[in-house]
Amino acid sequence: MKSVFTISASLAISLMLCCTAQANDHKLLGVIAMPRNETNDLALKLPVCRIVKRIQLSADHGDLQLSGASVYFKAARSASQSLNIPSEIKEGQTTDWININSDNDNKRCVSKITFSGHTVNSSDMATLKIIGDD
């Protein structure tokens, strides 16, 4: 009887851990080195097209100034969406979640994300980390 209880408890704990791991589905999509001069063609191409509901941006090294961002979806019409992003991200700072792919009926997968911006207050290139949540 004791072994049956132990097995049942172990299975219950395993299921709780499994579900907890699935609930936090954040993935590092990529990192972009930001040049010191304003550039409008910085692209993060996703090698595997994936459905991404929202993203976070983080400045890992140096301060960033951003002037725009767009998400491109794999679709027959090459659909895209402009993102509302903060104009500055300080080193070590992470943005709130930025919602994308709001069309719940037609789950489109993201093929690339483009950024316009540059490094500020640093002689080194800052890095922009993009985290996705599906």
UniProtKB/Swiss-Prot annotation:
Residues 1-23 form the signal peptide. Keywords: Signal. Pfam families: DUF2541. InterPro entries: UPF0412_YaaI (IPR020240). Belongs to the UPF0412 family. This is UPF0412 protein YaaI. It comes from Shigella dysenteriae serotype 1 (strain Sd197). The lineage of its organism: Bacteria, Pseudomonadati, Pseudomonadota, Gammaproteobacteria, Enterobacterales.
